A protein has these predicted regions:
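Extended aliphatic helical segments
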Residues: 1, 18, 28, 36-39, ...
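N-terminal Sec/ER secretory leader and immediately downstream segment
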Residues: 1-35
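Sequence-level detector for tyrosine residue identity
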Residues: 8-11, 25, 42, 62, ...
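Residues in flexible loops and secondary-structure boundaries
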Residues: 9, 16, 23, 57, ...
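Extracellular, luminal, or virion-exposed ectodomains of exported proteins
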Residues: 16, 27-31, 47, 127, ...
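A structural signal for well-ordered alpha-helices, especially hydrophobic packing surfaces
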Residues: 19, 43-46, 71-78, 108, ...
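Extended amphipathic alpha-helical interaction segments
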Residues: 35-102
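Long amphipathic all-alpha helical oligomerization modules
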Residues: 82-147
């Protein structure tokens, strides 16, 4: 009876681990999808801003520095995720794992919002400058604002 009880205890303990892993996997998948979106936002916006004649070389350098900082923070988030995923091979309490995943999720969501806001502000600045120069249609076409 004791042997059977121990067997079932071990079995249920493993089931709890699997359940936790599956729940964490969904969050990790969401984080990775947001990271991919952020990289795509950066690549698309940066390609457009480099073509935009309404920005000076100094402004483009400033933008690149901002993007570099955002990407560096993104890498830190990925490092934290790897730590959590690798923690399945070692011991880490589920509460600690969940705490790290939640923190990374919050960071990535905020970084994605910040990047979208930064891109939007730069597009608006270009539109403002274009309207002052009478080049509004050029900028609208560049940023797909009119079809």
């Amino acid at each position: 009876v004791q042997k059977q009880k121990k067997l079932y205890e071990d079995y249920f303990e493993e089931l709890k681990k699997v359940k936790s892993a599956i729940a964490n996997y969904k969050r990790v998948k969401d984080i990775i999808e947001m990271q991919v979106t952020m990289v795509n936002e950066y690549k698309g916006a940066w390609a457009l801003f480099r073509q935009d004649k309404n920005f000076t070389a100094e402004e483009l350098e400033y933008m690149l520095n901002i993007y570099t900082g955002m990407m560096d923070e993104s890498i830190k988030n990925i490092d934290q995720l790897f730590m959590v995923v690798n923690a399945f091979a070692t011991q880490m309490a589920d509460a600690k794992r969940l705490e790290i995943i939640n923190g990374v999720t919050d960071n990535v969501q905020q970084q994605l919002l910040d990047m979208k806001e930064f891109n939007s502000q730069n597009k608006m600045l270009s539109l403002q400058r274009a309207s002052e120069k009478g080049e509004i249609e050029y900028v609208k076409r560049l940023y797909w604002l009119s079809r």
